[in-house]
Structure formats: C-alpha cells, structure tokens
Amino acid sequence: MGIMLKQITKCYKIGEETVAALAGISLTIETGEFVAIMGPSGSGKSTMMNILGCLDRPSSGSYLLADQEVATMNDDELAKTRNKRIGFVFQNFNLLSRVSAWENVALPLVYARVAEKERLKRAAAILDAVGLSARKQHMPNELSGGQRQRVAIARALINDPSIIMADEPTGNLDSRSSVDIMRIFGKLNEQGKTIILVTHEPDIAQYAKRVITVRDGLIISDEVKEQSAC
C-alpha cells in the first residue's frame, strides 16, 4: 500500500503569470517508511504535502495511492480516500477549543457515524497510548503545547490510517516537547505506520529514515540514512 508520484506538476495563475509550485515530481514511498520532506519557504514542499494528503489535485501527472489513481478523483472520492487512509497532524494543532481532549479525539468518528459509546471508548484508548489518559477531560487551553500535539496525534490515529502526514508538527513546541513528539512518531513507524513529515528543521528531519529536499518545485536530493548494524 505505497505511494507513487510520476511527473507531478502543480501550477497557479497569479494575474497574467503562471507559477509552477511543483515542476515534475517523481517519487515512490513504500509502505512503512519514515520520510522527512525539507525545503525553504516557497520550495513546493507544502504543495507536495497537500497533494500527497489528497487535499489538492495536481495540474498534471499520476499519483497512485495503494494502487489507486488519485490525481483524477473528484472531491468526494478524494475525501473518502483521505478519511480512510490518512491521518493529519498540523503545527497549530487544529483542536476545537470548546470541547475536551477526549471529544476532540473522538470527532472523526462522529463523521464516520460511530455510536457515541464506542467512539469515546476508542478515543480513551488512544489517549492512553499517547500518555494522556489522565488529561482526557481537560480543555485544550488547559494543556501544554506538547500535550495538545499529543491530542492531535491521537485524533489522527482514531480511524487507524496507514499513513500519518505531519506538517511542521514541532514548530510551536519547545525542544523537550519536540523530542517527545518525534519519539511518538518513531514508535508509530515501528508499528508499521508510514510517516511523512514536512519540516524546515534539520534536527527534526534526522528522526526520519529518509530525507527528501525540495527546491523550486523539484526534488534536489533524496537520502536514505544508513541503518546501524547493532
């Protein structure tokens, strides 16, 4: 259940000018990989993440996700694929401020029409897995940044997606919380989840097993870390 991009482009019209955010990206990510995507502002890395996450469609090219062609899907098909296969974690957490951590995590199951008792049971189990069972009744403003990001990770996991996409997940965290969050991603990868991480921080990218660098809408390097023999 891997990912394959072939000659993906994404163009935007700005006035009379056409700007290519992606200029022909070809890439394969195997199931169970931990990949970091790096690049300066305007490099195309966020556009690439949006296409990988089925949040946007390319202007041209092919995107196979689990052997399904995604590039030509309509909005409903994209949404179904996204909800089934992908969990998202964002820099700003994107939590609902007026409901508890527990209810935030359970929210995707509301859309999936899972019964309330079952969704709260599943949300409690996942909060326990990320070390927040004692704070499940807390509101987001009663949690630290690291704790809020744990809630966001738990929410991303609630539908048991095969792929986790994280866009600058440590951008608003202190160094200690960043380490804790990256260790969670590492454990999820050990459990078989595919992790795709966008970051501009080299020290965060080093947690990944493969680092892809994007510039001017093109991949300029793709490096796999050597595994220790120990």
PLM regions: where:
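ABC-family P-loop ATPase nucleotide-binding domain
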Residues: 1-11, 221-230
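ABC family nucleotide-binding domain
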Residues: 2-214
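H-loop (His-switch) and adjacent beta-strand-loop-beta switch element
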Residues: 211-224
